[in-house]
Amino acid sequence: MRSCARTADHLFWMSRYTERAENTARMLDVNYQTSLLPQSEGVALVGWQGLLSISELLPAYTTLHGDVNARDVMEFMVKDESNPSSIMSCLSAARENARAVRGTLTTEVWETQNQTWLEVRRMIKSRRVRARSQASFSSGSSSVHTCHAV
């Protein structure tokens, strides 16, 4: 019985971390797209501050980076390992939970979870996130959708 509870716990957290990564990617994408609209720099910064506030990460961010700016918020929310809510941190935690119950997962679920983590890590290492194109969030988000669908 203990083994079933542990498996259920890992599956719950795998899904929860995957969902959190997806939600963060969506919020970043919406904020990025909004920042492209004609507006003052002050209004754009309010959007980035709002994103941090919604995520309850504004104090942690300002401790590390000080003033809010789009580039630092993106890096903090996508790849900063000191941020447990960053996309990379969430995908790493989801992958570790999936790995812990690898024997109970279908091959498709494991491969999708692992491939998503590998792809995002590759994008971060190649600095595609910094130069960020629409495709970056779209491809990451579609991989996460596939994890949920499988």
Residue ranges and their predicted role:
Residues 1-150:
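Alpha-helical transmembrane segments and their helix-helix packing motifs
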